[in-house]
């Protein structure tokens, strides 16, 4: 009987993961590559329980989606944001592994190189 209960628990867990993934899929941007989306979806799913909208609304989910875009735009496109905001999203993304990130040169770095 224990084996049957374990199998049922595993099936329930897998079903929950599928539902969460299906839910997150609606937020994928048309222009996101598979690599960008997988990273951003992990960010969203990791924090979804903390950002669920209360029954009366509140926009918590919108806030999470915005934070996920800030993080992805910074990582993949080199966008810069307010230091406090970047610190927050980088802390939220701690532990999310993304391979082969593009390398960006900032304007300041270019100016220093040019002046040398």
UniProtKB/Swiss-Prot annotation:
Highest taxon listed in the record's lineage: Eukaryota
Residue(s) carrying N-acetylmethionine: 1
Keywords: Acetylation
PROSITE patterns xref list: XTBD
Family annotation (Pfam families): XTBD
InterPro entries the UniProt entry points to: XTBD (IPR021859)
Domain XRN2-binding (XTBD): 24-116
Family per similarity comment: Belongs to the CARF family.
Quaternary data: Interacts with XRN2; the interaction is direct.
Record-given protein name: CDKN2AIP N-terminal-like protein
Protein's organism: Bos taurus
Encoding gene per record: CDKN2AIPNL
């Amino acid at each position: 009987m224990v084996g049957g209960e374990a199998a049922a628990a595993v099936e329930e867990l897998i079903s929950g993961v599928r539902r969460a993934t299906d839910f997150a899929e609606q937020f994928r941007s048309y222009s996101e590559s598979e690599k960008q989306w997988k990273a951003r979806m992990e960010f969203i799913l990791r924090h979804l329980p903390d950002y669920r909208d209360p029954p009366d609304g509140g926009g918590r989910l919108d806030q999470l989606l915005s934070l996920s875009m800030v993080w992805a735009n910074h990582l993949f496109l080199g966008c810069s944001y307010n230091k406090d905001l970047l610190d927050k999203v980088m802390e939220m993304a701690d532990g999310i592994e993304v391979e082969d990130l593009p390398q960006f040169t900032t304007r300041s770095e270019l100016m220093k190189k040019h002046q040398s």
